[in-house]
């Protein structure tokens, strides 16, 4: 995709007409709701098998190949297996909350998809309707709030388990989502300023001919934040197997564990759909000559799904290539790098918006500033701990060892008066008073006649 300087123009405030979303018949609203629910379930089943096959290819393995054609029904087999597993509840668990927590984790993942536009207006059984369940004047804020509600299920699951490892995992998850939710919110601000609206349908319409991926810092900031938001590698610290066994879902089994698994992959699909809507034009075709006519009917739904799969592959690629960060590196990267860079980029965007007079002259400077800040973010991600800081720590440790006192200079307590007393040697098999301590041997085995 090529974005010229003249196409990236700050939009005037847009007030999209949202009155049509309440005019659909009830059966059509119900049909679209069921379709969104089925789409999320199918994408989850597909994502699980797709991830296993891609990671197997990266590791030069075969991957799942037993259930269904070439193993593509492996997710159904795993789901049936989990449903038939024994459902165990720890004795020290708070049972009502322990049972409710997986549901609280999965439901918000479905709610965020209510305002995602899948396509333009189409005809369904003679009724004209948009391929979107609902829209709001603050749809993006609604998605941000719905995505953050899932942390309550994680916290309650760790607290109600009555175990140390789940509690530590839930606390990590809460700190992680709070930290990266701020950076994710900052990545949205530039999109709001350019689109002039918080409505998802309005943002997609404003990207006709120009995608907001040109806002490089916002795009990079969101891509990093969405990985931290979903607890995926390299930010899967709440589920660190080497430290916390399984994290917040250590004590869960059977269908309750499947709910957590379902919530994780639905969250992946949700944040990928948000990225597609805000930065890749949603259901709009790529701004390439010759594709402008493929933006009506059911064809835009295909564009949306292809962009969604691109972000899902990005998640899988990170899992197969990057190691897990340390917890201190992860939190320092969020608070010391992502949030300051996000604030700096918002300041740059707001400055250009306020003092904008000649868009064609100022837009190249805006794109240049965005590229520089985006490169800073990528470099910081590749070196989260800071190589210079790490060398300083190692040098301080070497100085500390060099300055440590030797054994001769350590003041030792004086020996007891009269010198050390040594007990006389005692023959083996006897105690200090001379009695035998030999354990009698076992009797010989009976000989069968």
Swiss-Prot record:
It is a multi-pass membrane protein. GO terms for biological process: aerobic respiration. It is found in: Cell membrane. The chain crosses the membrane at residues 26-46, 96-116, 136-156, 177-197, 211-231, 259-279, 298-318, 330-350, 365-385. Its EC number is 7.1.1.-. The keyword Cell membrane applies. One of its GO terms (cellular component) is plasma membrane. The keyword Plastid does not apply. Residues 396-449 are annotated as: Disordered. It catalyses: a quinone + NADH + 5 H(+)(in) = a quinol + NAD(+) + 4 H(+)(out). It comes from the Bacteria. Its main location: membrane. Keywords: Cell membrane, Membrane, NAD, Quinone, Translocase, Transmembrane, Transmembrane helix, Ubiquinone. Belongs to the complex I subunit 1 family. HAMAP family: NDH1_NuoH. NDH-1 shuttles electrons from NADH, via FMN and iron-sulfur (Fe-S) centers, to quinones in the respiratory chain. The immediate electron acceptor for the enzyme in this species is believed to be ubiquinone. Couples the redox reaction to proton translocation (for every two electrons transferred, four hydrogen ions are translocated across the cytoplasmic membrane), and thus conserves the redox energy in a proton gradient. This subunit may bind ubiquinone. NCBIfam families: PRK06076.1-2, PRK06076.1-4. This is NADH-quinone oxidoreductase subunit H. The lineage of its organism: Bacteria, Bacillati, Actinomycetota, Actinomycetes, Frankiales. The gene is nuoH.
